Amino acid sequence: MKRQTALSCAAVLFTVTAVAHGAGEPTPAERAVGYRQSVFHVIAGNFGPMAGMAKGEIPFDAKAFALRAERVAFLSTLPLEGFIPDSRVGKTEAKAEIWDNMDDFKAKMETFQTEAGKLAEAAKTASAIDALKPQFGKVGQACK
């Protein structure tokens, strides 16, 4: 019985390995697209609940807001790594203007980082959402 189990496991492992190799390795550009999409997905996952609090759709929780603001501030430093040359491939929502004017895009990303950092700092001591709404709005505008 142990031998049959071992053979079955070996067959499954061989099949999985063969399928994985058949799919081919992603190119650096494809990896960059996946990376930046993942980062933006995590940013959105943290930004969404803060937006819900700002809109009054969910109750304000100062600790949760501060945690999410801190995460967004950190995450805002990551996306640029995913915008490498020739990474305008596959399914991506990245606008063509990014590559047409990379310096402008980098400046906008720096603004996003700055505004997200200010929000994280303000959220550390805020006890009401109204105190955070103006800075939250600036982060949202910088993210467009």
Task: Give the label of every model feature segment.
Residues 1-9:
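Bacterial N-terminal signal peptides that target proteins for export
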Residues 15-19:
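N-terminal signal peptide c-region/cleavage motif recognized by signal peptidases
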